[in-house]
A protein has these predicted regions:
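Transmembrane-lumen/periplasm boundary regions of multi-pass, lipid-linked membrane glycan transferases
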Residues: 31-36, 46-56, 76-78, 178-284, ...
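Loop-to-helix entry region of an early transmembrane alpha helix in multi-pass inner-membrane enzymes
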Residues: 64, 68, 78-95, 129, ...
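Transmembrane-helix motifs of polytopic, lipid-linked glycan transferases
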Residues: 87-107, 145, 281-288
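Membrane-interface transmembrane helices that cradle and orient dolichyl/undecaprenyl
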Residues: 105-111, 143-163, 171-172
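Hydrophobic/aromatic-rich transmembrane helices and adjacent perimembrane loops
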Residues: 129-130, 136, 299-346
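Membrane-interface alpha helices of multi-pass inner-membrane proteins
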Residues: 160-177, 308-311
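Signature aromatic-anchored transmembrane alpha helix within multi-pass, membrane-resident enzymes
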Residues: 335-375
Length: 393
């Protein structure tokens, strides 16, 4: 009996719940991907006409991973269709979701793993990011660095973990905003990474250096030919407008928690990106994380939040893709804290524990239902959405 079969038999209930959740989430991500809005948005059409070949992508390498994947899929599906760019976004969003799920599996038990992933994946905020035919979903990929750095510290397969980390950094650097996360990770975990790399042969390290050099060469060449590419990568505007930046900074919490600016791409009317329950869990999660601020995971979550705020201040984006992961990490922390506090009050009462778990599960499912119906029913039938999504590819 191999080790995977043995692990499944020992903890089969956990795996069944996880597999069922995966099937449901895949269904949500792919449901009516091309037909929900009927036509495309102007921004989707503009991006669709950008970098239509790999040669053009080399000349303009911003968000290159998105365009390479999209163009490769387009070669397989000859008729021009809005499904192709949207499916490409879904693929990267699925990668974000996998990393989010994996990080939660390192930090929490099965109950919070399932509830936290469902809360994140069913969010209308996440669905708008994941299913729009724009490369915005890639800006949430910073959580991959969290996952890979944790894996590197724990695994015995140092070469494989190092290779995955190097490849990830090489591709993430093409995505606007990711350079801040990479630099922050190097400054914070540089000594720990050096210690991890000490167990790897110099030949393999040299190979990794050559590999990442090859991957980033098109980007370096593009920056050399056109220095403005660097501004786009970092988010720095060509002309600094302090008043505009302060306005962006002020609008971030307003848009997430209170009242969003009407935009058919990201929301219905002026509804905020978060619901009341998730907002409350976020506040509790910030408190809980502050209580455990010495833990690496607390520092990571606050670091992701800070860099998300920095980039979202520099760049106008109604979807705030770099904010969603840290916000939901705090929300999951809040849900976990609530359950832990309840369990501390009734440490030996299985009935009380069962009631608490059931109530929280019902709340999370209710929130998921609200967001799913909001995205799949209310949003596409909204007048502003219909007028905005009226372009043909």
């Amino acid at each position: 009996m191999n080790k995977y079969k043995k692990a499944f038999l020992i903890d089969w209930k956990r795996y069944i719940v996880i597999m069922f959740s995966v099937v449901v989430i895949i269904g949500i991500l792919l449901f009516q991907l091309g037909r929900l809005t009927g036509q495309a948005n102007k921004a989707e059409v503009s991006v669709y006409k950008t970098n239509v070949s790999h040669r053009e992508t080399v000349r303009n390498p911003i968000n290159a991973p998105y365009y390479v994947v999209r163009n490769s899929i387009q070669k397989l599906i000859k008729p021009q269709n809005i499904v192709v760019p949207r499916f490409t976004s879904v693929l990267f969003a699925a990668l974000v979701l996998f990393a989010f799920f994996s990080v939660l599996s390192l930090w929490y038990e099965t109950r919070m793993l399932v509830l936290g992933t469902l809360l994140f994946a069913s969010s209308s905020w996440f669905l708008h990011i994941a299913r729009i035919g724009l490369p915005v979903s890639m800006q949430s990929l910073g959580i991959i660095l969290v996952l890979l750095s944790a894996w590197l510290h724990q695994t015995k397969k140092l070469k494989l973990a190092t290779l995955c980390l190097i490849l990830s950094i090489g591709f993430l650097v093409y995505i606007p905003g990711m350079i801040w996360l990479i630099l922050a990770a190097i400054l914070w975990k540089g000594k720990a990474l050096k210690k991890d790399f000490s167990g790897i042969s110099k030949k393999f390290i040299l190979f990794c250096i050559c590999l990442i050099s090859i991957i980033v060469t098109p980007l370096l060449w593009a920056v050399f030919k056109n220095p403005s590419v660097l501004f786009e990568l970092t988010g720095f505007p060509n002309t600094l407008n302090i008043q505009h930046l302060l306005s962006n900074l002020y609008n971030i919490p307003i848009q997430i928690f209170i009242r969003a600016t009407p935009n058919s791409i990201s929301n219905i009317g002026n509804l905020p990106l978060l619901d009341v329950f998730t907002t409350a869990m976020f506040v509790i999660g910030v408190y809980a994380t502050m209580q455990a601020r010495k833990l690496d995971r607390s520092k990571l979550t606050f670091g992701l939040l800070f860099i998300g705020i920095l980039f979202s201040t520099l760049v106008d984006s109604p979807l705030l893709p770099m904010m969603i992961v840290p916000v939901y990490l705090f929300a999951v922390s809040g849900v976990s804290f609530m359950l832990d506090e309840w369990f501390n009050v009734f440490p030996r009462n299985p009935l009380a524990k069962g009631i608490a778990t059931t109530l929280i599960s019902i709340l999370v499912l209710s929130v998921a239902y609200y967001h799913i119906t909001s995205y799949f029913i209310a949003w596409p039938n909204n007048t502003d959405t219909k007028s905005s999504f009226s372009e043909r590819i």
